[in-house]
Amino acid sequence: IKEILHICTHISVKNYNMDKNIAKKLILENQQMVKELGFIRRNVEFEPHSCYVLVGLRRAGKSYMLYQRIHDLLQQGHSIEEILYFNFEDDRLADIQLSDLDLIKQAYEELFAHKPIFMLDEIQLVDGWEKFARRLADHKYLVYITGSNAKMLSKEISTTLGGRYIVQNVFPFSFMEFLQSKNIQLEKQWEYLDNAPIKRTFNEYFHFGGLPELVIREESFKRQWLGNLYNKIYFGDLISRYNIRNTAGLKVLVRKLAESIKQPQSYNRLANIVSTVAGKVKQETIADYLEYIKETCMIFSIENIEAKLQDKISNKKYYFIDNGIPNLFLLDPETSLLENMVAIYLYETYGEDLYYYNDNIEVDFCLFEHGKAIQVSYSIQD
């Protein structure tokens, strides 16, 4: 029995040390990586002594914002040894648990005498991460967190974090950022100058969206890259994260949302459409699916400001957070893409104050608190 206990104890300790050694290896590896990695600068400023949670669609540029912040910290005199960067999408961290987060901290402390600056990329993959994040903030660590679950924007998460973090929604590139990423400057009175490069760039942004990685892709490969991203990352993430069995129904739903960007959609109507293609689907299932898609930050919705409460909930207009995604499903996309692009800008600017109006007459966007009504038309026929 003593021999068995000795062997079991030895194995347990050995595995623990192996885990810590892996953590040390990743800490050092990531320090070297982020020091050398290029990035496309975003129009964002960080308060110097505040902790942040950056939330947005996968591949929307959250990691670039971390790299940018690391670069700025190094420029301000911080050492690369102070940076504790972890990307929880790393395959080597597939089975990581909440308790392992303390192990990472311990591994860092065995390597360096500095107080680390935590950069935790896609931490929502670790169940219970909020407790660890709050503890770090309570002990006055500087922490930057990214995640691709819209629940991280909720008041509940903010409360769990004790109000110690600034929670910021991260969108794909705006058109101005897209221009900057291509080193195109808008000069004064640019509309009267040779603006062919600007028009070409706008056409690219309009049809393929503003995901940062798309900037470096050749135009002939952009649609293929977006299709692979949607199928393998966005759609695949939905299936695995929420254990969805009716994958055909989910595919039809996303396509229908893209095809009906301009029209309000009820749960009943969507359930009927999906049921004709992918078998019987209940309204409750449609409501769940829509919530799942929103949680991945792929879509957002706005309500009719004049509707009764039940209609506000069940009869919304849905938009995609980036034009490249709906364009995968559209044959004649211009009218829908223009309204979607305007919706993105208004949602990024005004957030939950954005509505539509439908009471005998319809107005695409209504900002009641700001005294604005906005109608979007691609052509005179609209």
Q: Model-derived features: where do they sit?
A:
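Interdomain motor-coupling "hinge/lid" segment immediately C-terminal to the ATP-binding subdomain
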Residues: 3-13, 19-31, 150, 156-263
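Conserved P-loop NTPase "ATPase switch" module shared by AAA+ and STAND
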Residues: 112-129
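Accessory nucleic acid-recognition modules appended to NTPase machines
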Residues: 16, 82, 219-370
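Short glycine-rich substrate-engagement loop in P-loop NTPases that contacts/grips substrate
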Residues: 84-114
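Pre-Walker A adenine-sensing motif
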Residues: 30-49
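Walker A (P-loop) phosphate-binding loop of P-loop NTPases
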Residues: 58-59
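Conserved lysine of the Walker
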Residues: 62-63
